[in-house]
Amino acid sequence: MPLLDSFKVDHTRMHAPAVRVAKTMTTPKGDTITVFDLRFCVPNKEILPEKGIHTLEHLFAGFMRDHLNGNGVEIIDISPMGCRTGFYMSLIGTPSEQQVADAWLASMQDVLNVKDQSKIPELNEYQCGTYQMHSLAEAQQIAQNVLARKVAVNKNEELTLDEGLLNA
């Protein structure tokens, strides 16, 4: 099985919260697709609670689009990582890490402004596969943590995993 790009970075050196360009690719039509690693937690030290990350998934996707889409950028998808330390965001375009960080911080403020669990989008059995597994309070605690710590930038060249550690 091929070694995926996400496993070629040293998770012991990652900062969080932090944004990282995980991958860029060019489509046959010439569009650039950029995948960002939006790391909310320090790997192997912190983890996002399951109800909070699920609620954040519902809120974050819309709020990030509000703040980042436009001027050659269109978000394709924002999905939580299986390790529950962050999200991957795929988009058309090449915004800077700072633009992404600014949109992320603005989105976290938006999460704090949600007044009631009933305001979580798609919170019903028809649009959500686990609609009862939500916590606005946990999502807001995650948002508060990001706002308090700010968003750094993780650079790939600083995180390259030593080949001797591969498959260790």
From Swiss-Prot:
Belongs to the LuxS family. Homodimer. Disulfide bonds: none annotated. The keyword Metal-binding applies. The gene is luxS. Its EC number is 4.4.1.21. Keywords: Autoinducer synthesis, Iron, Lyase, Metal-binding, Quorum sensing. Its cofactor is Fe cation. It comes from the Bacteria. Involved in the synthesis of autoinducer 2 (AI-2) which is secreted by bacteria and is used to communicate both the cell density and the metabolic potential of the environment. The regulation of gene expression in response to changes in cell density is called quorum sensing. Catalyzes the transformation of S-ribosylhomocysteine (RHC) to homocysteine (HC) and 4,5-dihydroxy-2,3-pentadione (DPD). GO terms for molecular function: iron ion binding; S-ribosylhomocysteine lyase activity. This is S-ribosylhomocysteine lyase. SUPFAM superfamilies: LuxS/MPP-like metallohydrolase (SSF63411). Fe cation binds at H54, H58, C128. Binds 1 Fe cation per subunit. It holds the Pfam family LuxS. It is an enzyme of class 4 (lyase). NCBIfam families: PRK02260.1-2. It catalyses: S-(5-deoxy-D-ribos-5-yl)-L-homocysteine = (S)-4,5-dihydroxypentane-2,3-dione + L-homocysteine. It comes from Neisseria meningitidis serogroup A / serotype 4A (strain DSM 15465 / Z2491). One of its GO terms (biological process) is quorum sensing.
